[in-house]
Amino acid sequence: MIENNKEITLDIIKLLPKAELHRHLDGSIRISTLLELAKEQNVELPTYDQNELAKLIHKDENCSGLVNFLEAFQYTCSVLQHAYAITRVFYEMCEDAVADGVSYLEIRFSPVLHTSFGLSLSEVMEAVCDGMAIAELNLPIKARIIVCGLRHLDPSISKDLAEITWRYRHKGAIAFDLAGPEDGFSSKHHKEAFSIIRNKGINCTLHSGEDSNWTSVADSIHHCGAHRIGHGIAIQQNEELLNHVVNRRIPIECCITSNYQIKAISNASEHPIRKYFDSGAIVSICCDNCTMSNITLSGEYKLAIDTFNFKVEEVIRLIDYSFASSFIDPPLKINIRRESFKKALKIFQTNGYDISGVIENKFYYFEEIGLDVELEIQNNLANNFSLGKNVIRNYPQITLELLENLPKSDLHCRFDGGVSIEQIWNEVQLLGIDKCEKSKQEFLKKLSSKHLACYANFKDFKEFKSLIQSSSHTPQTIRLSKEIINLLLQTPEQINRAFDDIIKVALKDKVQYLELMIRPNSHSRNGLTKEQVLALIIENKDKWEKSSSIKIGLVVFSSSTSDDPIETLDSARLAIANRNSGVIGFGIFGADPISPTESRHFSQTFSLLKENNFNLVQFAGKSDVESLISTIHCSGSTRLSGAFQSHKIPRLMSYLGNYSIPVEISLTEKLKSFTSDDLSFTTPIRHLLDGKCPVVICSFRSSLYPYSRSKMYYKIVKNAKLDFKQVVRLLKNPFAYNFQSHQQRIELVQQFNKLSKEYLNSVNINYSNIII
């Protein structure tokens, strides 16, 4: 019998599959093992009575604060100076975790704390790797290792530990952490360590906002590239930072009991986990130090459930958040998530709990782990190879008509490159350039060089179209076309007409969401200031959003070719100043990306964007991989444009996929030119898709090409041999990976689903298990 509001008991919680992401080796040793090892190694302890020793080690009663909490580590570390002891404790931690229902465990420790008796860092690492291997051979658990640097030690030590993390990446070391006191020991001091971490694409989590303020967390994210935040209590001090963590999907490792015991909060109910969860943040319930806190992960779930009134569906989501936030490889992660979800749901269902909330939130589970909750319940939550059961066997043929009628989003439409050829010709006619040779020559004098004017031979619309949309564009003709279009977009009237044309064409292409890229400096030849240009664009955006179904985001951009660092900084300030008027990001584009050596000249711009948690998209990876790495980690880009060379390093492609870093791409001459080596066995777009990179197809400068968005998609689909399911994913990506807030992205994806189903139903196309 199903009971509403039935108590979620500790026994039930123990049965649930769980992942633990924040557990310290030297803080989770059994008291009995501590005693045995001390006797074996002749280590002096204050007492050898197990009960009395437990009173010293456990901090669940009368802990006066962090200093008192840390005192116990002197005893645990003293017996962990020999390889066999380290191996044993790692194994026993896994054993204890399994007894508590934990099926995935990340154990963190600092190897440097285990070298007092002569072990090298490598010997310490071999010892934990042995413990992990033995555990996985004998226990139903997956375990991994996180190596900790220490803030208060010399940065050179952290550098060595970062290097050892990289060297043991294939033996189970999956991430680097920075632990230790925050105040007075900024993570910025350890830049050499994080340079290694970033350049090698190593996962990264930092203890931040535990015993310090929100700036420590901001430093961890913006300067160190943290993929997760350990503790993060201080995030609540800054709403803008919290929104950034939510929107960037940066998980927070929440250690409720530990935070209470060190007096970071006065009681468990003051922990911000519920606030974070309700704000849309990804939170993971963790133990920190099981022995010192005298807790289990099941107990921490029980504490959170009872204190913050988490319901069945929320508990299942908390469980999934932890598995989703793990640093394990993506193919294994997604399958662990699916099986853990099914197991948890079945436990609640068979024990009489109301699971209607899970069905109500089926959108989350379908989009996140690809499971149709209702279908899984119908199939009795089969655990073995159930994914794909009842899925369409015969996908519909992908036709141009199908693509024309499905909803789309475009995340990179250039204002001076997205105007239709008809509207551009209209501006030519309004200036009389088509009728008067003198007017034409006066117009062409405004081009940047006389050499370019030599190519501008057109007498009528047909010749003009052949010039602007040449089937054999060269760098010269592309440059000429861009300059001609730009010269025709200099007055308020021209800007207004161009905006109207761009939106009308987008609506015709069934575009529901558009990110319009605008470089205000490009439209100031006739005396308009960049502020006036942007004000015109914002006014037009507001007008169209009120009068039509389209939603528009504005991205101010700078040219790495034409703008110097001072002009780029000025444009970034303009973008941020208008963030409440629809400007949602900043971009840097050009003929060539900013190289790693040049990026320091733009450091003020990058720092400003980071300080304001402002989205950045940047052109990178044209002909080198280095610019991709510096663009992600030094510039702080949340989206990449181009990324033509990412396929050369499979680990980099995996990184883009694992951290959902979207790649803007289109059928441009640049794509063909800089990915020619990739075409021998696949297409560049298919290569990125198969690597699980969130590819977003964009129109860029559609004025230069004679096909609509739908025709561009059709070419891509045919060249890459995509099936219906892959096409749906490709179309959905820009709805899910744009610069809007997390909640708005959810709403956009739901809009895509709704409109897609309406059309597919009208033509009797089955979309089971593809769209929900």
UniProtKB/Swiss-Prot annotation:
Gene name in the database record: ada
SUPFAM superfamilies for the chain: Metallo-dependent hydrolases
Metal-binding as UniProt keyword: yes
Keyword Metal-binding: yes
Required cofactor names: Zn(2+)
Name under which the protein is recorded: Probable adenosine deaminase
GO CC annotation: cytosol; external side of plasma membrane
Keywords recorded for this protein, A-Z: Hydrolase, Metal-binding, Nucleotide metabolism, Zinc
Enzyme class: hydrolase
GO molecular function, one term: metal ion binding
GO biological-process terms attached to the record: adenine catabolic process; adenosine catabolic process; hypoxanthine salvage; inosine biosynthetic process; negative regulation of adenosine receptor signaling pathway; nucleotide metabolic process
Note on how the cofactor is bound: Binds 1 zinc ion per subunit.
Family to which this protein belongs: Belongs to the metallo-dependent hydrolases superfamily. Adenosine and AMP deaminases family.
